[in-house]
Amino acid sequence: MKKFLEAISTYIALANQRAEHHVGYCGDEQEEILHTISHEFSDLPVGESIAVKHENDAIIGVLGADVDLGDGTAELWGPFVKEGQPAELALELWEDLTTRLGDKVHTYYGFYNQQNTLARDFMNRLGACKGSSHLIMHAFKQKGVRINSRVDELSPERHASFIKLHDEAFPDTYMSGLDILKRLDHEHKVFTVESEAGIKGYVYVAGRPNHNEGTIEFIAVDPAERHQGIGTTLTKAALAFLHDELGIQTVSMTVDAGHDQAIRLYGRAGFEVVHRMEHYTVRVTY
């Protein structure tokens, strides 16, 4: 199994480094991908969650599903199809994968680079519903970025205020305010700007220094407290923590492509656009 996973992670890493094969749910570093599929990938065994096609003992196609059994959904890793292979190979991988998963999964999500035409055609042939467009933005380590004195780490007495702000700002997201609180540790933190009445704004950051990976997962400012520079202050605080305290060189975040004001805010804080992405949903019935 170890050699099998190493071969798959190498194949995915090489493919995902190219925009025309890029899938947003997985990275492009072999060691990080290997760690994820070995320890964090899917609620089901890897053998059930990844379909692979070979030709002359060489991998020519991979499609994985990061399954959440709790809600019957999965994020698609792929399809990754070797150049020169027919597009129908992606459909063969799909049939293989969905046959294994059966009724354990009813909804699949795809998140693909706009230049990934194979994935776009694949989604269209499956009758997927196209969702919103997103930007993946990166910020690289800068000198002199410090955490503003207005910013504090979330304290226990502000937990209720944080949950209220987060759940109102992101009512339908994948992680509730309570979920975030359960994850907090030395690599996952919430920073806030507060008043006596409660939290004006917050940012939730997640770092994986062993893989040089850091993300700004959520950021929100109370609507009554906007236009005070709080968003920029929080973004810079997040970068200072991830860059300086965890030693992460590149920080990423995903932004709705239609949120021009947010994109400008992140640009002022040091982020730049690196990928333009499309989101898809495939619902299956049995």
Task: Give residue spans per PLM region.
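Active-site rim helix/loop that mediates acceptor-substrate recognition in acyltransferases
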Residues: 15-16, 24-49, 170-196, 204
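Glycine/small-residue-rich hydrophobic helix-like segments
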Residues: 180-246
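Conserved active-site alpha-helix within GNAT-family acetyltransferase domains
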Residues: 114-132, 232, 257-275
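Conserved donor-binding loop and adjoining core beta-sheet/short helix segment
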Residues: 32-92, 203-217, 222
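Conserved beta-strand-loop-alpha-helix junction that forms the acyl-donor binding cleft
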Residues: 81, 109-119, 252-263, 280-286
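Conserved acetyl-CoA-binding loop-helix of GNAT-fold acetyltransferases
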Residues: 85-99, 125, 221, 227-241, ...
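Short amphipathic alpha-helix that is part of the acyltransferase structural core
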Residues: 1-35, 134, 145-173
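Conserved GNAT acetyl-CoA-binding A-motif
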Residues: 101-113, 242-254
